[in-house]
Amino acid sequence: MAFKCNEPAVPTLQQEDKTVRITRWDFAPGAATGWHTHSWPYFVVMLTDSVMKIEAPDGAVSEVQRKAGECYQRPAGIEHDVMNGSEHPMAFIEIEIKRPEELVRAK
């Protein structure tokens, strides 16, 4: 089940080609992405200090404090809904690696 929210998070595509997709996500307080699955491994770079609430497929909700500039990565196949649990806007950049083999230079 997805978080109940009055407003969805806003994705803004920054760059996309055959190897990567880079998206900026902006969340008003209480906004959520909606339930989704990541097809590719991805990295997140936080743009704001925030409280991120994450709902897992089993319904468990975790609450994580994130700092601006903090980064983390996750593998492909992650299923979740992400909500801004802060009282202020939350933003991050998501970098999805669509074809990692093409990012490696031939020797």
In which residue ranges do the predicted regions lie?
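A short glycine-rich, His/Asp/Glu-containing loop-to-beta-strand
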Residues: 5-35, 41-44, 92-95
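Short histidine-centered beta-strand/loop micro-motifs
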Residues: 12, 25, 33-38, 55-56, ...
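Short acidic-glycine-tyrosine-enriched beta hairpin
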Residues: 15, 58-77
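Histidine-centered metal-chelating micro-motifs
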Residues: 30-33, 69-83
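Glycine- and acidic-residue-biased ligand/ion/polar-headgroup-sensing regions
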Residues: 38-58
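Ligand-binding loop in jelly-roll beta-barrel domains
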Residues: 76-100
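Extracytoplasmic/periplasmic copper-protein system
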Residues: 103-107
